[in-house]
Amino acid sequence: MSTEGGPPPPPPRPPPAPLRRACSPAPGALQAALMSPPPAATLESTSSSSSSSSASCASSSSNSVSASAGACKSAASSGGAGAGSGGTKKATSGLRRPEKPPYSYIALIVMAIQSSPSKRLTLSEIYQFLQARFPFFRGAYQGWKNSVRHNLSLNECFIKLPKGLGRPGKGHYWTIDPASEFMFEEGSFRRRPRGFRRKCQALKPMYHRVVSGLGFGASLLPQGFDFQAPPSAPLGCHGQGGYGGLDMMPAGYDTGAGAPGHAHPHHLHHHHVPHMSPNPGSTYMASCPVPAGPAGVGAAAGGGGGGGDYGPDSSSSPVPSSPAMASAIECHSPYTSPAAHWSSPGASPYLKQPPALTPSSNPAASAGLHPSMSSYSLEQSYLHQNAREDLSVGLPRYQHHSTPVCDRKDFVLNFNGISSFHPSASGSYYHHHHQSVCQDIKPCVM
């Protein structure tokens, strides 16, 4: 057979062995190596390495211990320093600064200057006085010196004196203004409001003038004092000679015939018109005394002669009872009787008519008062401020010489028919009714 004579078939190859890592030992070898004791050289090397590692560990631990000890020491030292600083702060906080004196710097400077016999000090001498007197200025705080300089230079109370030629040193003397010394009289160093000295200086002349001229029953104001009251106040009158000013007397009071400056006391009488007010019991106005003759002059609104009091007749308009009229008629004729008064609204609204006077004989006085009159106006152009004229009464037999009376202040009253007091060239007041006409009193219908 051909099959038996041919070459035999090759034998089958064995399967390839599984791949193994060269680095990883066999499991048996590893176990055997672990179970078998290591050789001596290996033990020596491992022991040396372990000892070196332990030595390194010991050195590192020692280093850490030393570092921790150093940190603890530094912390302790810092804590001790902090405690020491806290103790010093507490110790210094217990020493409080002395309290400031209860005076202003102006008062302190005035104290220093007044303590000097010459009443003047330099800036350094003021410093020395304050430091010697008050413990507050002896401390570490030095800002008070700036305050002293500020008050010296900016306050009106202190004057910087010029430096003397032969005086050594560089500082100027400071003294107190003589006009401000009254602010610190009797050791009073209290604080004053701003502008106190200027107000006091402005009020000083007026105060002395009023104090020297005030009085009751005598001259109220000095000769040169120019008194002009506002519309709501009674009008003042100038005076000269024996009068000198206003007379503040109740109505009906007779100042007496023996006033100084009267040549013929038996010819002069002084009466006063009561206040025009709705109630008869109201107060009276101040008035100006005017000398009189026997017959009398109707120089005021509705003023009658011979002691008779009269006003508008019953046919005229009612008399207003406004209190503003009270301040208008003040410098008046003395011939109006003290018993004359303005009627109240409840009573008859008209004034009494004199029996001897008729509306035809005295048309100016019989005209009614304007009911809407509320105030008066003082015409400055008619005021005789410089010329002191004597009132010559009417006819020659009534004239008297050198009688000091009120200045002729001219009142423009808001009346319809009542005469307004305007001056004329004659300068004389004539009897208002009967045989003569009044040349100085002209009707002024407003």
Curated annotation (Swiss-Prot):
An example Gene Ontology molecular-function term: DNA-binding transcription activator activity, RNA polymerase II-specific
Protein keywords: Activator, DNA-binding, Nucleus, Transcription, Transcription regulation
Skewed-composition ranges (Pro residues): 1-18
Tissues showing expression: Uniquely expressed in the bronchiolar epithelium and in type II pneumocytes.
SUPFAM superfamilies with a match to the protein in the record: Winged helix' DNA-binding domain (SSF46785)
Major subcellular site: nucleus
Signal peptide bounds: none
Segments of the chain annotated as binding DNA: 100-194
Region (Disordered) residue spans: 1-97, 257-278, 304-325, 340-371
Bias kind Basic residues: ranges: 263-274
Subunit structure: Interacts with the transcription factors TBP and TFIIB.
Job of this protein: Probable transcription activator for a number of lung-specific genes. Mediates up-regulation of the E3 ligase IRF2BPL and drives ubiquitination and degradation of CTNNB1.
Protein name as catalogued: Forkhead box protein F2
Lineage of the organism: Eukaryota, Metazoa, Chordata, Craniata, Vertebrata
GN (gene name): Foxf2
